[in-house]
Each structure stands twice: as structure tokens, then as C-alpha cells.
Amino acid sequence: MELKISIVTCSDTRDLVQDEAGAALEELIVAQGWTVASHVVVRDDASEIGDAIVEAADECHANVVLTCGGTGLSMRDVTPEATRAVCDRDVPGIAEAIRAYSMTKTRRAMLSRAICMQRGHTLVVNFPGSTKAARESWEAIADQLEHAAQMPAGGGHTN
């Protein structure tokens, strides 16, 4: 299955040109042989983040939406809340896997509030905003993304 993956970077301080983490994710997606369906940068605003997730899922028909940033403890970090507001079902194992993998790199990973949910047939995964942490999050789950994206679309389990 060829995946279409959208990137939504959540930041008050970056634009598309300065979005190093998003650019790194684009490279990783393409290296996997998948398609970048869209890539936007929005402010750390729950409404804007939610709208961008909805557009990526519903208009761009992304199988997966990766948000980047807004997952920490700052009062401006609202990506998990924005994700929850526009999605239907929790997929806790993916966020748990990212945290577990990231804990082998830095103990600060325990401070992440990142979540993973479904919006219809689209998987929405929160990644941290730093380039290093976004790459590590990708490493943690990339080998399972295709299967995870097939499941909501009616794909069966494989061993």
C-alpha cells in the first residue's frame, strides 16, 4: 500500500522555510517510497491545528497525518487537545511506542503529552517539534505505519 502522509507543523516561531523537523519528515516519507500529501505550518492554536488535521484527512485524503510540535508542557502546547477534538478513536499503543523508544534516547521523553488517534480512516500521530525527536519518533513507528493505515480501511491482520 502506498501511503499518503500529511505533515502539520504546529509552531508560533517557524514558517514552512524554517520548518526543519517537517522537512526531515518529508525526506523520511519519500525515502520510504510514500507520498507527502500536504505540509503546512500553523500557529499553536487549537482551532488552527484542528482545521489543518481535518483538511489533511478529509480534503487531502491522507492515510496518516503527522503533527509536529505542541506536545510538551507549555501552556501554548495544545496539539493533543486539538487532535482529540477532531478525531474519533484513541490508538494509545503508537504514542506509547514512541515514548518507550524515545526514553532510550532521553529521559525527558516522559514529559511528552503526544497522542495518536483516528479520524475516520486516517491515523493522526503527534510528534515532538524538535528535528531530532521527530526523527526518533519516525524510527519508532515507521515499520508499522503501513499496517496501521490499512486497518481502518478494512485491511486484515497479518502475522
Please identify what each model-predicted range represents.
Residues 1-159:
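Non-catalytic beta/alpha edge segments that cap or flank active sites
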